[in-house]
Amino acid sequence: MKYPIGIQDFKTIRKDGFVYVDKTALLYKLADEGKTYFLSRPRRFGKSLLVSTLKYYFSGEKSLFTGLAIDSLETKWDQYPIFHIDFNGSDFTVPHTLQRLIKGRVEDWEREYGFQGNPDYSPGERFVRLLAHVHKQTGKRCVVLIDEYDKPLLDVLDTERKVRLDDDELLMEDYNRETLKGFYSAFKAADQDLRFVLLTGVTKFSQVSVFSGFNQPEDISMNSKYDAICGITKEELETVFHDEIDAMAEKLKVTAEEMRDMLKRHYDGYHFSNEMTDIFNPFSVLNALNSRSIQDYWFRTGTPTYLVRLLSHTNENLNDLTGNYYDTSEFVDYRADVERPLPMIYQSGYLTIKDYDPYSNSYLLDLPNNEVKKGFLTLIASNYLGTKESATTLAIQLYRAIQLNDLDVWRKSLTAFFASIPYTMRRKDMETEKERYFHYTFYLIFRILSTYIVLTEKQQSEGRADCIIETKTNVYIFEFKLDGTADEALQQIEDKGYARPYEADSRQVRKIGVSFSSKTGTIEEWKEA
């Protein structure tokens, strides 16, 4: 099987025999039932391939779709004038790049259709007049496809980069936003000349005028009809890649069922609507099947620096954001004047929907899968703690220690890790800040550890332990105290009854109390009962 890794052109995929997960039934529904759309999906999730597929569909290239679902649905195969802008390939941290790109594309189209544009008009105004001309010239309304519309904003988001304009200086974030607003708001006036419009991107910026006023696009990002339009569903994985999964299982010397479970835990877990359709990360799945190895393919392709910048100056830690139910208004629209990173984290693919409550119409958000847990949390831990030691390396050491039933290695590994955190990073003046720092540090460590071993979250009437790990032979119950004693931690395990559910268990139950010092920043006492 040939995997289209790095290939986003639909014609190339079809002509050269690469595997294609058939999304054309949804594509037909999209084109048949509406006109102007916006779709938000994380990077490398198939948006560009969707745009490319639509381009060839509206070009009437029927032969490319032979044998696909749309082949039996479409009967006309009309050709339409297509205007396609892809913002993917440009670096918008360079001043005036966005303006030159839009102006250049409009001028190219004017030459293509023999239209003399007025240089005194803005690119948006020239585009409106061009659409009207082409509609009249061809007798066909136009198709506009804009891929990664928000990249000019994401490139400069939350930076201090500036652009000089006449005798003034503006933040590039503001300048690029105003440029996009001018372009998008202008061509919205061309409604009568448009057959179909799709904008794709990572983030829905509420302050870009395409999402306000008349003729605004229908946002299908959370529409259950289209929740599987990008990515790979469980059914698609099983039907299209059944034999490939079996071959991968054979190479890794696991059963086919274990292989499917490994793929699910590492790459599944995305949900884009209240229907809770399971969606696998397509980029990682294709790479894993191609190389027959479980690796963090998607996360390695790009560090989410804009997210790190946002998180670095917000009072909200990741543990404040995960595991909570939200109204859609809290995580769908990103507003640049509000210092809440939640919408950006969700839409970038680092959080996803994990449950839906129909009574409150609210959504539970959490990390989607092990690839994201390990990569994103390690990145945050490195920036938050400032340690030279990798939190992932620590998690592996803790995992290996549990496998060997060696708690002394646990103690030594934790001690060394905490000792590597610079004093300037852990210095907190207020007691509440010290406590918050302490708990967030352990949240990051144990969420990363959970990608290697299952951490039990058993809620008791009196609360729950800081960490419970179950193996085939042992149960480990940890309780941590900041500026307390190990005896106090052990006493809490007894008083709260954390071990009670395991009284009839044949496995050995090991209770560990650990105290940390906010002054030294490391372990003071370690006792086992």
Model-derived segments and spans:
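Conserved catalytic cores of phosphodiester-cleaving nucleases, focusing on short active-site segments
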Residues: 442, 465-482, 496
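Domain-level recognition of nuclease-like catalytic cores that cleave nucleotide substrates
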Residues: 501, 505-529
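Metal-dependent nuclease catalytic cores in nucleic-acid-processing enzymes
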Residues: 183-190, 343-351, 440-447, 492-512
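Phosphate-binding site recognition
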Residues: 1-434, 449-450
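C-terminal accessory domains/tails appended to large, multi-domain proteins
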Residues: 453-454, 472, 481-483, 497, ...
